[in-house]
Amino acid sequence: MAHFSSEDEVMLQAMLRQLFQSVKEKITGAPSLECAEEILLRLEETDENFHNYEFVKYLRQHICNMLGSMIEEEMEKCTSDQNQGEDSGYDTVVQHVTKRTQESKEYKEMMHSLKNIMMVVVEAMINKFEEDETRSEDRQRKMQSGSCCTDNCSDSDSSFNQSYKFCQGKLRLILDQLDPGQPKEVRYEALQTLCSAPPSDVLSCENWTTLCEKLTTSLSDPDPMFTDRILKFYAQTFTLSPLHMTKEIYTSLAKYLEVYFLSRENHLPTLSTGVDITSPNVTRLLKKVRLLNEYQKEAPSFWIRHPEKYMEEIVESTLSLLSVKHEQSHLVPQKILDPIYFFALVDTKAVWFKKWMHAYYSRTAVLRLLEKKYKCLITTAVQQCVQYLELCEAMKADEILRHPKHCGTKQKSFYYSGQELQYIYFIHSLCLLGRLLIYTQGRKLFPIKLKNRKDSVSLTNLLVLFTQLIYYSPSCPKMTSIMCSENYSPASMVTDVLRMLCDQKECAVECLYNSTVTEALLLPIHNLTKGTAAAPDCSETALIHIADILARIASVEEGLILLLYGENMNSSEEESLTGAHIIAKFSKKLLEEDISIFSGSEMLPVVKGAFISVCRQIYGTCEGLQVLLPYGLHESIAKAWKKTSLLSERIPTPVEGSDSVSSVSQVSPNSVAWEDNLLDDLLNFAATPKGLLLLQRTGAINECVTFMLSQYAKKPQVNRQKKFGYEVLVVQVASTAAGAVALQNSGFISALITELWSNLECGRDDVRLTHPRATPVDPIDRSCQKSFLALVNLLSYPAVYELTANQELPNKAEYSLREVPTCIIDIMDRLIVLNSEAKIRSLLNYEQSHTFGLRLLSVVCCDLDALLLLEAQYQVSNMLLHAQEENTFEISENHRNFIIDGLSVERNHVLVRINLIGGPSERILPPRMLEKGDDPYPWPMFSSYPLPHCYQSEGPRSADLKQDNDIGNLLSCFKMSDKQTEWIENCRRQFCKTMKSKPDAVHGSALGELLEKFVLLLTENPSECYFPSVEYTATDANVKNESLSSVQQLGMKMTVRYGRFLNLLKDGAENELALVLKHCEKFLKQQQSPVTSSLLCLQGNYAGHDWFVSSLFMIMLGDKGKTFHFLQHFSRLLTSAFLWVPRLHNSRYLPVDTLGTGIHPIYFCSAHYIEMLLKAEVPLVFSAFHMSGFAPSQICLQWITQCFWNYLDWIEICHYIATCVVLGPDYQVYVCIAVLKHLQRDILQHTQTQDLQVFLKEEALHGFRVSNYFEYMENLEQNYRPVLLRDMRSIRVQNT
């Protein structure tokens, strides 16, 4: 189109005519020009013939010619990238190509050229249309002049109604009739005619400018009916005409008002006399202001479709009007009201400004004009806020507003005093400034210089002023309308503005998250805590508003850090408490009712709830809980809950006719609400592992879980302040034995399983399938996915043990189709262990339901303790083997083949998973899906042991490697130093050096010798010993006849199989390992104390297998003596508490209240810090966990408990153990952080596919090596070791 000829122009005109002719009915039926434009813009969606129009075909061909080759090149690039492994769908490719095309030079040139050409074509069509219209009007004028002599009668009341267009002659007549010299009736009739005409016709007339001037002049007419008619015409124009026409009306009205306010002739109200809105002059003025304001609020909805100059003219005329200010002088002693006062009367909350600032299109113009020409508008708004605060400080609350409309009055008043007008203007200014601060360019308008003040008002000054307004401003009477008081009370209005700022993160960081503002918020609270005089008029309502803002600050990471540590996180000044400490102290005093000025207040429970809510935002995080721990808030909240619960129980049952009925109806709902609030506060302690320990110590875990179920059933939308959804709370609670029992007793598990069964077995059969299922069937139907993940979250080993231990399967002879499972045992019986025809017949969707059960079994059995328990109780391996045996067909007399189907493939996978131990390179798990080709499943199936060798990797490492010089140097450390502290540090340095340079050397017999010597010498240093020495004299003969649990026996066999595979153990190792385990149980039993508890895990010996002892036995190459002697020495070190899980089972070294919870220090200490460090070091992964409704603590607890068996290769397990033994127990935390950092990409991917917990439990840690992350872990040690070791050392009972 570079050569655009006249023929091309004619052709395009014809195409456009065809298009407009086709859509003529749609356009002419539109009520306004904006609607017509919208119809054209959406034509492709609404017109089925859209692509048949010649103009559309022309555009498509033009785009193809100009951009076709470039689009094809981009498509080829994307296709090649996809073939190289980048997984991107069709939509992604389209988006990429579209973006690249729109950013290209060719596209911009094409659009520029096309716009220029279309402008020429459209301009020519408009000119031709105007010529046709002129000729048509001439003909019409001639016809009218001929017909007026022959027919003076008309059926209508106006000749206008008989014409299609409003003629010029008629407008000239109206202009003459509107002249001030004309009689009143003539002028009124002219206005009546004008209002009857379509505004677009009037505005398109050539005399429109003159008419506009006449109307503007006539607005000053004293006759109210006449001005009302003009305003009616203006209103019609605003409603029905396009922007470029209504802009004329708006600017003329704004200019009129500006002149009106500047004129000395008009008798404007003064501030001292106030405003009587029944006064005719004031009424007329307010009508004009209101009309202007109504259009202000409507204009932003459509002005983006018009040239920017129209919008700018409207904005500038408005700002010019609002900037009009009457200066006081000796000639005019009284303050005359400015236009802004009247705008505040009709739009108190400055809604017009909110709408103008919403879109970037208009916001840019507003802010530019405010900065360059009308900054005085912002200055006066700030000045008004400053003056109002000074007024509040100078006068008592009840003297500030004698008739506080903002607090609500029963009788409607039509008079506004000067003080009330000042207050209304203050509210308008407050809302305007609040909206201004949201935007970056708006904040750049500060600081503001005020008259009679030396210092400028900065952003921080303004925010401090806002917070002071909450405390100093008058509070509303308690009996007034709640709605009114909430809408217009000063404290509520300021709080609304601060809430708005909090919701904008960038704005909040710049404005609110600094020590000056938080100190201003906390100052009266701090004074109340210390017992000194608080700010004047610091009411309970003000405190509630402040708590609301503090809760919002604490809900954002930057705000939380500010409250926890202040702006200077490295400050060592202990006397200056941070915000979190002040809030915690104040909340504790409130709970203990230790603040005298609030005693007996009806609002006290609300104040308590508000500040506990702030604390909840803080202690709901790991780092926040650490700061608030010394205040014992869990105990104070629990005490308050028990007191409230006891009071509610004492309320008598209302009896009809008794005097107590009314009092009970009033007290009971408030009491129940306060009790629920306290339970919710307690429940939120479960958001972190250590918080869950504190919750269980209070004894309220059952009530909290029951409350959670009631809330979960309502399925509430979790608001922004609640950072943790109930799904994460369930995961944390289910990670402990007591929590699992509480979930069972509350009915949560029953409700979950009932919902699962409804989706699994009772799903709709008439659901339309849009595509056939994959082969084999989709493992878990979409409707059941949520229930599946909920069960995966629930079934940690502590939960599995409490819910299934010592319970047999029902194994009924017959199952009713109406019989719905209600517990985990029922799920095992009906979906997993299908060992009878009765169970199979009871399932309506047998294949889908059993597949679901097998998938669940696969995930649960990834926890080796859970696998051993299920194997010991239900022999799941034999059940699966038997099912495989039955799923065969005979092909010859002595040979049978397996039937390949979805269930047999799933069973084969589970059998390999639960029978082979090994890391990512030590075992091979068969896939769950069939392959394309002639052999869809090349993996061998089996129905008896041993497993086919193809599932084990070839060439396991030999037990003894040739000793390296580095490991030799490491062992020599134990002989060369006289000072114990020196050799310990020297040995650790050498170990780190070896792990970084030659990690494979730390393996085999050399590793066993290293650990043995290091621990022996370490225990010779009393300062390194954490637990006391225990005398143990039992011999093999003493323990030989002791029995091991079935779980321990199965675990022992599993260990020996793995050790033989690795060439670490020899024949007879099983008996040696059995003796080691028996000695360990006897040795640890000497250090246990009796525990009275209903929890199964606390009754008797440790419930799981001792994976640490098994690992040590393999490291020591099956040497029983070395293994047990090492463990005896090792048991004195702090590290043993975190590596050797059974070490602290029912241990007398733990506090009694900790012992009774059944929670291991690995969970409430190590896992707690894993979550805390993960949030700080790998925030994306931390966020991914919470988006998935899963907790890092649960999977890390599983990894640590089984010493990473099945997740890491043997050499990496050795490195993990050696690292923790040599460098300290805190390295357990650092290793887990390194693992999660290593998995970051996979974790983010599986968060999107919504199967994160399944991935983490089932998948080995591919590619992870401890040595690769050694420097990273050393950095973590430098940053966190003091805090971690201090907390780890605090787990033991403190000697007094």
From Swiss-Prot:
Residues 1158-1281 form the Rab-GAP TBC domain. It comes from the Eukaryota. Its main location: cytoplasm. Keywords: Cell projection, Cilium, Cytoplasm, Developmental protein. GO terms for cellular component: cilium; cytoplasm. Disruption phenotype: Mice exhibit exencephaly, poorly developed eyes and preaxial polydactyly, due to defects in ventral patterning. One of its GO terms (biological process) is lens development in camera-type eye. Pfam families: BROMI (PF14961), BROMI_C (PF23440), BROMI_N (PF23431). Required for high-level Shh responses in the developing neural tube. Together with CDK20, controls the structure of the primary cilium by coordinating assembly of the ciliary membrane and axoneme, allowing GLI2 to be properly activated in response to Shh signaling. InterPro entries: BROMI_C, BROMI_M, BROMI_N, PHAF1/BROMI, Rab-GAP_TBC_sf. It is found in: Cytoplasm; Cell projection, Cilium. This is Protein broad-minded. SUPFAM superfamilies: Ypt/Rab-GAP domain of gyp1p. The keyword Plastid does not apply. Interacts with CDK20, which promotes CDK20 stability and function. Interacts with FAM149B1; may play a role in cilium assembly.
